[in-house]
Amino acid sequence: MPVISVRRHDGRRATPIELKLSELHGQCQKRIAVAGVCSCPQRRGVRTMSACVYGPVPACLGSEMGAETDARAGPLGGDARYVPLPVKQSWADVVFLHWRIPVAAAHPYMPPGVEPDLYADTTWVGLIGFRVTCTCLGPHLRLPYAGTFTEVNVRLYSRDAAGRHGVVFLSLDADRLAFVLAARAAGVPYVWSRCRPTTMRGTSRGHGYEVERFRGQGKSSFGAYPDMDHPALDGLSLWLTARFGLHTRVGRRVFYLPIAHRPWPLYCAAAAAFEDALVRAAGITVHGPPDSVLYSPGVRTQFGQPRQVLG
């Protein structure tokens, strides 16, 4: 079996998540996002970082991510023909809440040519909150106002005939009107709402989000207390978060929009008391507390050129 170095090419030791993925995907043709030296005879000494789990990483993010890439697509990766767009964002203090749902509940929300993605014969719905910061157009143009906001989204998990894994958004709430209008014009169903991050105090510092839609159309309040000593390394947690694109319908056509970033620094977390009407408003019924609660300090992202999904 080919061996991948546990040190990144910038000299730093690989993170526990990267090491776990290296263990799970040690074969050379399924190289994970650990920039190392491949000992495969055909590629001996070639420094690589593949899209097997984390999707293609554009060269212009290489210095930020501390890694290089051969931009191949893999089992959970994005489109091998990934073409980066000059749009970058940072996603910070990400709280992931997930519930297991029947596959039949997700089917009606899939665009043509897209089907629910499954993990152990089940699919999931997610309620995710995070802060968007440092939005840039091109290498130098920052958007300090329009590009800084709070987002809360409800999403399902999808896969198309080309094997691209992604998400289908049922709703996205954000507190920056300019961004909402631009995103809706691109076919992404953003809603302008009152959104804000909250900090919870207890035995540890927690992170949460509050959303209130205008005209009383729904609200949500949720959060999590992360355990920063326990990285989330299980297969389900990686499957839920290693999503590097979204499927969306624009008019009569369906597109896959790739999004590239380095591996999530992902941690187990405990849910705080929460009240949510957004998942129900999106048409999905869940019962009880979430089945999975995760937290990430965040990642730097770059959007790619949309690809049409052929049904």
Which residues make up each language-model segment?
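Ala/Thr-enriched low-complexity intrinsically disordered regions
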Residues: 14-15, 33-35, 48-51, 59
